[in-house]
């Protein structure tokens, strides 16, 4: 069995520059970038940088994109995704000298989910226009799998720099993860 495909995005930005942008934007920026559920967690530099890394992972801002395409969730990422994210975070920490101590799982929907599905699907299975949730092939029991897109991110700040790392992957229900 082959390993699942993932998309990777990294954002490295000067912390002062990011804090100034968030400070200038205030509540309007918070509403623009973060969903209502996320605003209760705080929509500061973390939300902006992590969402920038998620945007990079899906290949940019597709037509119809909104910042709300990505939403932090309380559920943990897929069990197989956690070690992959940890390893990538360790590599990035080694190269930047900055440990990535924060983390969260994300729901991916809308235009960004469709863009990710197109990039993650095998070329022979990729529909011309994939919906955010698409019926996939059958699971071993014969029931169709639901293909949704999920993500996980890690971040850290220090030495005047803010770093975030995100992976985006298919979360297929009705199929055991490798």
Identify the meaning behind each predicted range:
Residues 1-178:
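Core catalytic alpha/beta fold that binds nucleotide/phospho-ligands
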